[in-house]
From Swiss-Prot:
GO terms for biological process: translation. It comes from Pseudomonas putida (strain ATCC 47054 / DSM 6125 / CFBP 8728 / NCIMB 11950 / KT2440). One of the early assembly proteins it binds 23S rRNA. One of the proteins that surrounds the polypeptide exit tunnel on the outside of the ribosome. Forms the main docking site for trigger factor binding to the ribosome. Keywords: Ribonucleoprotein, Ribosomal protein, RNA-binding, rRNA-binding. NCBIfam families: PRK05738.1-3 (NF004359), PRK05738.2-4 (NF004363). This is Large ribosomal subunit protein uL23. The lineage of its organism: Bacteria, Pseudomonadati, Pseudomonadota, Gammaproteobacteria, Pseudomonadales. GO terms for cellular component: ribonucleoprotein complex; ribosome. The gene is rplW. GO terms for molecular function: rRNA binding; structural constituent of ribosome. Coiled coil: none annotated.
Length: 99
């Protein structure tokens, strides 16, 4: 997979209360990914970008919420979430990948 596709697959970390608990207790990290990304692409992107070994990737398609505005109903975009499990002994540090 080329370097350009790696940056298009991983859109960024998803920070939430549940994601923080998963990272601390189970060593699982949550990313916002492209809607057309496959599990294999996500695995290769995380391994290549952060130099870690990935054990498992689970994906969830999150439906956008319907919101009311002054002009009627609107809808937020659908997006895809990936929960990445690392092999035992591996840890992910977001600050070191920016080098």
């Amino acid at each position: 997979m080329n370097q350009e596709r790696v940056f298009k697959v991983l859109l960024g970390p998803h920070v939430s209360e549940k994601a923080t608990v998963l990272a601390e207790k189970k060593g699982q990290f949550v990313f916002k990914v492209a809607t057309d990304a496959t599990k294999l692409e996500i695995k290769k992107a995380v391994e290549g970008l952060f130099n870690v070994k990935v054990e498992n990737v689970s994906t969830v398609n999150v439906l956008g919420k319907t919101k009311r505005t002054a002009r009627g109903l609107g809808k937020r975009n659908d997006w895809k979430k990936a929960i990445v499990s690392l092999q035992p002994g591996q840890d992910l540090d977001f600050s070191s990948s920016a080098e």
